[in-house]
Amino acid sequence: MSIIQTIDQQIAEALSSNTEYNDYRERWEYLFQSYMGGMEYKDGRYLTRYQLETDAEYRARIYSTPLDNHCASVVQVYNSFLFREQPEREFGTLDNSPAVLSFLRDADLDGRSLNSFMKDVATWSSVFGHCWIMVVKPNTGAVTLADEQVLGVRPYLNLMTPLAVTDWRWKRSVTGVYELVYFKYVEEFTPSGQTVKVWTPDTIQTIEVDQKNNRILTDLTEQNGLGYIPAVCAYNLRSSVRGIGVSDITDIADSQRMIYNINSEIEQSIRIDSHPSLVKTPETQAGIGAGSIIQMPDNLDPGLRPYILDYNGAELSAMLAVKQNLVEAIDKMANTGAIRATEARTLSGVAMQTEFQLLNARLSSKADGMELAEEQIFSMFANYMGTEWTGHVEYPGSFNIRDTENNMQTLKTAKETATDPGVYKVIDYEILELLGKEEPAKYLTNTDGLPGAYVPADTPGVPAGENCANCSYYNPFDQGCSKWDETVSPVYWCRAWEGRIEEEIENMREDT
């Protein structure tokens, strides 16, 4: 084999990709453009082309058609709930480590905090179905961890979409665990080519390819000290193919594309209605615009007089109805009908609650995936630091999704119907909770209706074991005190305290 053939083979191997990548690449590009919108989507040329339509006419129609980007809207809704509360992290052996503190502030050495980085992970895994995270540490030649700390060297993260990862291979170990044994991705695009990184459990190879001149500029191989490939596949939802996830917008993107084409038809319909086509002979001179003058030859046959071409296409209202049906279908697919609604919808309380529960289940599943990915990241981070990860990461597992306006209206109706003062107190408590306020018993310390000795039960001087919860005047149903006719806290105490016998306590427990 000649040297030229050898070089060509090396370049082809460096730029090659596996079967899964080749099969999914076109779909991934479509999902990426559907999420990004703007010029990315216009460059995809997703409008259906008319017969005999010229390139110039097609481009003009693309640039005049707006895109309703439902893909980005759905992903943003998911992230707004998923990261409403910050995850809780316990670092175990890495607690108070300067490297970890620096890592939390700047996870990718590009200014993004770990929380911001994980938001991007959630975004791209939602778009593509999965994304890849590399945990890497620069090789500066430092001998000890102390030397690395002096130089400020620590592990950092590199987020890659599936479009950048061109080849990967899994192998089942003797213990039955699947391990990543080959991982190749495009690290950087250069003016003349690209830089490719190839990881194996033993080596790290960096290849810089000059595609214009068909040559390899750099081929550097170094040892992989970890003994495994520090890559994390963050799934949105696992598919039947290892290393491939299920996107949240894979079906939404198709409906979005249909809406995009309907928008084009609506725009064309409005143009035709406003500016209908004029049929005339070549000799007839007609101006353009409202009130234009038409000059006909003197000897023109009356049967050849100019006339307006009638348009018998679909009605505008019919196209708008189809578009609205597609939007409702998108909301059903994403379980965001009550969240993204822009107008009041007639839904029963059960239907709305069911929709919220489905969205809550979807968000909980996404949170579990984020927990798993982040714990794998910290496990690799700890290996780089010469220790084992003993901490844990916890994302919110339940998302309190309620229709505040509908619940408030229900409570208002209940209060107008009720006659029992005790029920009034329960409704007032529910209203305060709905508004995000603390329950009255938690902040009520003294009112005109309570004695001055109304104090927390752990206050010095209060008899041990005495509190409002075990007082005979206390009603646990509405947290009311029949002695003072006030709402009280079960962990407070006053001088009017009177104990109740165990039978009374047990009966009240059974009643409540």
Regions inferred by a protein language model and the residue ranges of each:
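Extended, helix-rich architectural segments
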Residues: 1-157
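Charge-rich, acidic-biased intrinsically disordered regions
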Residues: 8-18, 25, 36, 49, ...
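A broad, structural surface signal
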Residues: 116-119, 127, 138, 257, ...
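Extended, regular secondary-structure scaffolds
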Residues: 122-239
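Short, well-structured alpha-helical interface segments that form or flank functional binding sites
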Residues: 128, 254, 314, 318-321, ...
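Extended, charged amphipathic alpha-helical segments
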Residues: 214-354
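C-terminal helix-loop subdomains that flank or include functional centers
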Residues: 299-302, 317-318, 325-433
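Cysteine-centered metal-binding/redox modules
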Residues: 432-512
